């Protein structure tokens, strides 16, 4: 039977995505212009919900295509403009450069990462201690590096472990070429247990980036914006956040202990003994067969790792440029000089970079259609500690839906305007800045669209291998979401004002004048 041209086009549309999914996207594209004609505000929220739906279905179809189609249509019907989308991309250029260069840079350091993490996983037999070491390490690193960089490291390590086991279990040698996406030659029981084990470590690490990232001004992009507007330096930012961030960090680690001990929310998965043996054999094989040149590579990569941490922690250059320097140093000192060998490093990050640009287009729609304005004005109508709590909650809820960088920057801009208009005092402003920072960083672990690092993990090459779907990520993050949100909320409501006063009395921080924030804000 001959296929008609329309049927052929439909078959090609979104490839092997399920039929119901294709029809759903087509339905979205048909109804959106009509909703926009009736009520642009409702149309804006409809588009945001549809975009979140494409993220939730990331394992069925990469979100770039359906999300991109929805955005292109939104541009044509006037929900936003290419110029505004371009502006949002320009504002977030550092994040895009970070993705392109830093993730590729990490790729060229994977020999060192595998060397270190294989030793860690083999030596630490206790899963609880291993989980705590992963969450603590990712929190510590995220306080100085960018969360995306830390997640890129963890993904690289996870992929390394997975491919080693997959090769050996499929009857291949460590150095054989092998397709680790095909499970045909494997025993399924150990593989499922190993997937569960790696999923646990991935999620603990991802949450760790949020715990550490909230503490310092370099931890997350929106922290820099908030510190900049408020005129705080690195130390002052850390001290002002401490009354909320330190209790949250402690309770975050306690949550890890409870989850690993009880085995709830699919945590507590152990490393199967057969897989451990393969990793031990791999470690021995690599140690025995390591040549002088390979040892030299590891030493150079360790030195580059030190440069990476020092460069990022001291802000010697923008994150993307430091990533570019890592690529240049790592490849030139490892002898990787062919274009095709360089190209492999960019495969992981570029699809996500394109997706993030689409995401910034959706942010442009949110701004142009004023989707968050009613919430912002409502929150500003409160006073005192209630206002701080409402800021924290409103930031948290909106950060679960939208990008937390956008939410944080919108709120701090609104609060700075309120300060300049004389609606709030400078001391109130400083405490609201703490509530905004913690509100955007902590509850946003609830969904992958809240944190760029979580979204990167969801759309990375490792997610389908570990069966890490949007729903599963939300479910595994749920206990952390509840604990971090509640502890952060209680610390903001009960402890923040008193603790800040104690810090003033101890002269660890000083009172600012309203003029400082105004001058800072005008400059940016």
From Swiss-Prot:
Keywords: Antiport, Cell inner membrane, Cell membrane, Ion transport, Membrane, Sodium, Sodium transport, Transmembrane, Transmembrane helix, Transport
GO-annotated cellular components: plasma membrane
Catalysed conversion reaction: 2 Na(+)(in) + 3 H(+)(out) = 2 Na(+)(out) + 3 H(+)(in)
GO molecular function list: sodium:proton antiporter activity
Localization in the cell: Cell inner membrane
Membrane topology: Multi-pass membrane protein
Main location: membrane
Source organism, top-level taxon: Bacteria
Transmembrane segments: 25-45, 97-117, 135-155, 234-254, 302-322, 352-372, 388-408, 445-465, 474-494
General function of this protein: Na(+)/H(+) antiporter that extrudes sodium in exchange for external protons.
Family to which this protein belongs: Belongs to the NhaB Na(+)/H(+) (TC 2.A.34) antiporter family.
Name this protein carries in UniProt: Na(+)/H(+) antiporter NhaB
Taxonomic classification: Bacteria, Pseudomonadati, Pseudomonadota, Gammaproteobacteria, Alteromonadales
Gene name of this polypeptide: nhaB
């Amino acid at each position: 039977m001959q296929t008609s041209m329309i049927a052929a086009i439909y078959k090609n549309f979104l490839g092997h995505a399920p039929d119901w999914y294709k029809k759903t996207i087509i339905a979205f594209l048909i109804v959106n212009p009509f909703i926009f004609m009736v009520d642009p505000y409702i149309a804006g929220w409809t588009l945001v919900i549809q975009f979140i739906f494409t993220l939730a279905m990331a394992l069925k179809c990469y979100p770039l295509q359906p999300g991109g189609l929805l955005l292109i249509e939104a541009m044509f019907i006037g929900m936003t403009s290419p110029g505004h989308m371009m502006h949002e991309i320009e504002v977030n250029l550092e994040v895009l450069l970070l993705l392109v260069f830093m993730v590729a840079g990490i790729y060229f350091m994977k020999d060192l990462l595998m060397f270190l993490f294989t030793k860690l996983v083999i030596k630490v037999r206790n899963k609880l201690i291993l989980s705590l070491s992963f969450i603590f390490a990712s929190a510590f690193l995220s306080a100085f590096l960018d969360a995306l960089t830390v997640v890129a490291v963890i993904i690289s390590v996870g992929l390394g472990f997975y491919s080693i086991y997959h090769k050996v279990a499929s009857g291949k040698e460590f150095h054989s070429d092998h397709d680790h996406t095909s499970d045909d030659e494997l025993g399924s029981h150990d593989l499922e247990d190993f997937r569960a084990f790696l999923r646990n470590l991935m999620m603990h690490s991802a949450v760790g980036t949020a715990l550490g990232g909230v503490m310092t001004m370099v931890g997350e992009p929106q922290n820099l914006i908030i510190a900049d507007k408020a005129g705080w330096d690195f130390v002052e930012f850390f001290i002002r956040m401490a009354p909320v961030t330190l209790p949250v960090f402690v309770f975050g680690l306690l949550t890890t202990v409870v989850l690993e001990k009880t085995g709830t929310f699919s945590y507590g998965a152990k490393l199967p003994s057969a897989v451990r043996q393969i990793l031990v054999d791999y470690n021995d094989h690599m140690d025995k067969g390591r040549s002088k040149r390979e040892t030299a590579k590891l030493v150079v990569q360790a030195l580059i790792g030190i440069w990476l941490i020092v460069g990022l922690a001291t802000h010697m250059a923008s994150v993307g440029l430091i990533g570019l320097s890592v690529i240049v140093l790592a490849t030139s000192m490892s002898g990787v000089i062919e274009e095709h060998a360089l190209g492999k490093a960019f495969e992981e990050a570029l699809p996500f970079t394109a997706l993030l640009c689409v995401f910034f287009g959706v942010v442009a729609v949110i701004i142009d259609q004023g989707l968050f304005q009613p919430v912002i004005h409502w929150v500003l109508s409160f006073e005192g500690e209630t206002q701080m709590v409402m800021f924290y909650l409103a930031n948290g809820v909106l950060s679960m839906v939208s990008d937390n960088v956008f939410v944080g920057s919108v709120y701090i801009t609104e609060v700075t305007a309120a300060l300049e208009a004389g609606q709030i005092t400078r001391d109130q402003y400083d405490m609201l800045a703490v509530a905004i920072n913690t509100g955007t960083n902590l509850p946003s672990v609830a969904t992958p669209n809240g944190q760029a690092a979580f979204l990167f993990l969801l759309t990375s090459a490792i997610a389908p291998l570990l069966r890490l779907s949007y729903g599963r990520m939300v479910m595994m993050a749920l206990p952390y979401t509840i604990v971090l949100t509640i502890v952060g909320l209680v610390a903001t409501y009960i402890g923040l004002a008193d603790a800040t006063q104690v810090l003033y009395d101890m002269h660890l921080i000083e009172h600012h004048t309203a003029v400082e924030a105004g001058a800072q804000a005008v400059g940016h």
